[in-house]
From Swiss-Prot:
SMART domains per record: AAA
Tree of life domain: Bacteria
Protein's name in the database: Hemin import ATP-binding protein HmuV
Function per UniProt: Part of the ABC transporter complex HmuTUV involved in hemin import. Responsible for energy coupling to the transport system.
Subunit structure comment from the entry: The complex is composed of two ATP-binding proteins (HmuV), two transmembrane proteins (HmuU) and a solute-binding protein (HmuT).
CC annotations in GO: plasma membrane
Membrane topology annotation: Peripheral membrane protein
Stored Pfam families: ABC_tran
EC number: 7.6.2.-
EC main group: translocase
InterPro entries membership: AAA+_ATPase (IPR003593), ABC_transporter-like_ATP-bd (IPR003439), P-loop_NTPase (IPR027417)
Keywords noted in UniProt: ATP-binding, Cell inner membrane, Cell membrane, Membrane, Nucleotide-binding, Translocase, Transport
Length: 261
């Protein structure tokens, strides 16, 4: 059964000064899938995510759940679309649990309900033990996990219309929490029929957790396919200038990118 398209962008272009960041991108994302946006530094991954999320405003054609982006009120869309940025500039001395509870602002819930939902996602992202810590005193990875819990809280009451966007969510995390974050994202997609779009640099992490890979290079999509189809020595060489061999994980059976020499 074909999955419904919940987010579509057509002919998306973006230019900063004289630099063409994105060039006529056509892309669609479905419910229940994890899509990794990949590519070298400067390929346009984060810019595409910001354009799709509305963080960068545009008059170009973007649709959420079949409805033009410009037709959505911000408050209504925030119940269905959550964005985890690469970093946060929050400096106010909130307690960690208060940061997570900020995700419930768009929701009409009692304080007890907000607390219960926030605690659920704090447990999932392994930050319960930080609940009464001051946010500014936390490490970068701890802050990132808190904000992940906040975004999951934001989407808790959105029914079957959920889009979760993660911009390099593993960049500040240790090995165990990198895998836990992507495991939670994949579980969120499958169990809640959510569309999950994640910007990553690690091809092997993407191969393990993503259903699709959209690989960009110089502002254009080079390939949009499954990990098995996208990860070839030829594509990796053309995009990254890196000679690679493709193997298989011995127990989990996903493609592994390895150095050719």
């Amino acid at each position: 059964m074909k999955k419904p398209v919940v987010l579509r962008g057509q002919n998306l272009s973006l230019q900063f000064a004289s630099r063409q960041v994105l060039k006529q991108i056509d892309v669609a994302f479905c419910a229940g899938e994890v899509v990794a946006l990949l590519g070298p530094n400067g390929a346009g991954k984060s810019s595409l995510l910001k354009l799709l999320s509305g963080e960068i405003t545009s008059s170009q054609s973007i649709e959420y759940f079949g409805k033009a982006a410009k037709s959505w009120r911000s408050a209504a869309l925030s119940r269905h679309l959550g964005l985890l940025p690469q970093s946060s500039s929050l400096t106010f001395p909130f307690l960690a649990r208060e940061v997570v509870e900020l995700g419930a602002i768009p929701l009409a819930l009692s304080q007890a309900e907000v607390k219960a939902i926030a605690e659920k996602y704090m447990a999932i992202t392994d930050v319960v033990h930080l609940a009464d810590s001051l946010y500014p005193a936390l490490s970068g990875g701890e802050k990132q996990r808190l904000h992940f819990a906040r975004v999951l809280t934001q989407l808790d009451q959105s029914g079957d219309k959920k889009i979760l966007m993660l911009d390099e969510p593993t960049s500040a995390l240790d090995l165990a929490h990198q895998h836990n974050t992507l495991r939670v994202a994949k579980q969120f997609a499958k169990e809640q029929n959510a569309c999950v779009i994640v910007v990553l640099h690690d091809l092997n992490l993407a191969a393990q957790y993503a259903d699709r890979m959209v690989i960009l290079h110089r502002g254009e999509i080079v390939v949009d396919a499954s990990p098995e189809e996208a990860l070839t020595p030829e594509i990796i060489d053309a995009v990254y200038g890196y000679k690679a061999l493709i193997g298989r994980h011995p127990t989990l059976d996903f493609p592994l990118v390895q150095p050719a020499a």
